[in-house]
From Swiss-Prot:
Task performed by this protein: Provides the (R)-glutamate required for cell wall biosynthesis.
Family: Belongs to the aspartate/glutamate racemases family.
Pathway stated in the Swiss-Prot or TrEMBL entry: Cell wall biogenesis; peptidoglycan biosynthesis
Protein name, per record: Glutamate racemase
Species in which this protein is naturally found: Leptospira interrogans serogroup Icterohaemorrhagiae serovar copenhageni (strain Fiocruz L1-130)
Keyword Isomerase: yes
Length: 256
């Protein structure tokens, strides 16, 4: 019997669980190891060099778990580490891409707001993407220090208070398209829609998972409601707080 393909996913904390949920929508017989580096979260306000070291350490751990590929299910980790680690590891390293391209192409000439961590906003990867799309004038970059940390704490009331003035300001500027440039923020979609009902939200999870499965030559068949998922996953959270394990379970079971 053929062994299932083993894939490693990593994030600074809970955000990558939104990517894991996307992966579990497919009828793909996978063995998934998820590592949440909560001990060192959040990544988004650290220096890029420190993030690189943290991500390298997690990837070394995942390689010892005998994974065949690693997905950095974290925009900050991707921005700071993906390019370097692809040269260091013999297995494929995949990363996240903010969904700026579909947002720009589907709304020609219209402004697009990008919510992301300070590291993601600063790094060359994002500047290069905006330049390739000739979208420097159209992308309104909004740095959100501390917001991912509120998701890791499960403090969605504080997250809503944090987002309200940002969303109100976007409505005043007639910005109708919002890109979530951090996998943590995907868990805030309902809060965003509650405060900004007409906004069109884009995130990179679906495109990333399609690219991952295509690259690994895994069939992309969406599960229907009655099918059982044949993939199995293991959650590793380097946290001593039982709360984090309960929160992870809650986030994985959230309806979209």
């Amino acid at each position: 019997m053929k062994e299932p393909l083993k894939i490693g996913l990593m994030d600074s904390g809970m955000g990558g669980l939104s990517v894991l949920k996307e992966l579990l929508k497919y009828d793909s017989e996978l063995e998934i190891v998820y590592y949440g580096d909560l001990k060192n979260s959040p990544y988004g306000e650290k220096d890029a060099s420190e993030v690189l070291e943290l991500v390298r350490s997690v990837c070394n751990f995942l390689q010892k778990e005998n994974v065949s590929a690693i997905l950095l299910a974290c925009n900050t980790a991707t921005s700071a580490a993906a390019q370097t680690l692809r040269k260091e590891f013999s297995i494929p390293i995949f990363g996240m891409e903010p969904a700026i391209k579909p947002a720009i192409l589907q709304n020609p000439g219209k402004k697009v707001a990008l919510l992301a961590t300070p590291v993601t906003q600063r790094e060359e990867k994002l500047q290069r993407l905006k330049s390739e799309l000739k979208a420097e004038e159209l992308v309104l970059s909004i740095s959100c220090p501390g917001l991912a940390g509120l998701v890791d704490q499960g403090d969605f009331d504080k997250a809503e208070k944090y987002l309200r003035p940002i969303l109100a300001n976007l409505q005043e500027q007639d910005v109708e398209n919002l890109v979530l440039g951090c996998t943590h923020y995907v868990f805030l979609k309902q809060i965003i829609l509650k405060n900004f009902p007409n906004v069109k939200i884009y995130d990179g999870n679906s495109g990333t998972i399609k690219h991952l499965l295509n690259s690994l030559q895994v069939p992309r068949v969406i599960l229907n409601g009655s099918q059982n998922n044949r993939s199995i996953y293991k959650l590793i959270l380097n946290s001593e707080k039982e709360f984090h394990f309960r929160l992870a379970s809650k986030l994985l079971s959230l309806k979209e």
